[in-house]
Amino acid sequence: MERIFCVPYSLYPGYGNMLRLGQSGLSEPRQPHWRQTNVPPTFLARPRLLMPSNASDCCVDPYKRAQLMAVFSHMNPGLSLRLRKANTKDVGVQVSLRVGKSVQCSLGPRTLDSLSPWASAGHRAPASAWGVSSSVPGHWGEVRLREELSDPPEAGQPPPPLPPPSPPPRSEEDPPEELQPREELVEEDSSSPRERKSKPAPVDSSQPLGRPNFQFLEPKYGYFHCKDCKTRWESAYVWCISGTNKVYFKQLCCKCQKSFNPYRVEAIQCQTCSKSRCSCPQKKRHINLRRPHRQELCGRCKDKRFSCGSIYSFKYIM
């Protein structure tokens, strides 16, 4: 009985075995070769742990994984199974039935940080003070996606300077030096309230405002004018960068396919009252605010069905 090595943990089906070690003349019990069987792998209690090639199939099952973690915790507390880093990217995709394009957003590649207990804590990026986080229930727990909206600091940027040391405490022998700042405070308090309002508030220029590193798009009313074939038509679905008249998706002329359009872009609103919904009796030109892409300029939109929802739909993954 002294030569029988007992495993300190409870035996699970398919895990562990009782072997006779150090006994001369006795052969080890024969077991089927693990390469020729499809059963779960058998881990033998030896000084060197044997890891079969089909161990990954057993780690997928949560129940068997818990058993395997119990085995490893008894053998070596520092030994644990680590999951691979998720390789994911955040992109913006333009879905269109008429124009087939895929545009990668300026967010660039991002990696999902896992909060599972088996994930390594060294690969996690520090969370920003101003970020967007969304929790998605996954197989191993909650996955949080964080985006740093502010620009990262430069690598060569020196650290902020330390504050100057405070002056030594003055003794009671210097009373006239203490009276001078008090007189200055009295003069500042005696100033009129108008002068106080006129003085601008101090602005800390050492902390620049954070700028987002991505751009949103919005549809604007566009004038398409071709200088080559003298064609002029209008369309409401011109995708511009939000807050500007800069066109994001450019396209060629529908007739000559030479010059880029649009020539000019403005918001979808009435030209008289500058409102999206108005009841002006006279308008500068015919604009149907409900369906602004149907215009009576060149006749290309007459008797044609256009679906506002299926032309463009832009998706942001944040």
Curated annotation (Swiss-Prot):
Gene Ontology CC, one term: cytoplasm
Family that this chain belongs to: Belongs to the ZAR1 family.
Region (Disordered) residue spans: 149-211
Coiled coil: none
Domain of life per record: Eukaryota
BP GO terms, sorted: negative regulation of translation; oocyte maturation; translation
Predominant location: cytoplasm
Protein's recorded name: ZAR1-like protein
Annotated source species: Bos taurus
Domain remark text: Disordered region at the N-terminus undergoes liquid-liquid phase separation (LLPS) for the formation of membraneless compartments that store maternal mRNAs in oocytes. The 3CxxC-type mediates binding to the 3'-UTR of mRNAs.
Matching InterPro entries: Zar1, ZAR1/RTP1-5-like_Znf-3CxxC
Subunit: Interacts with YBX2.
Location within or outside the cell: Cytoplasm, Cytoplasmic ribonucleoprotein granule
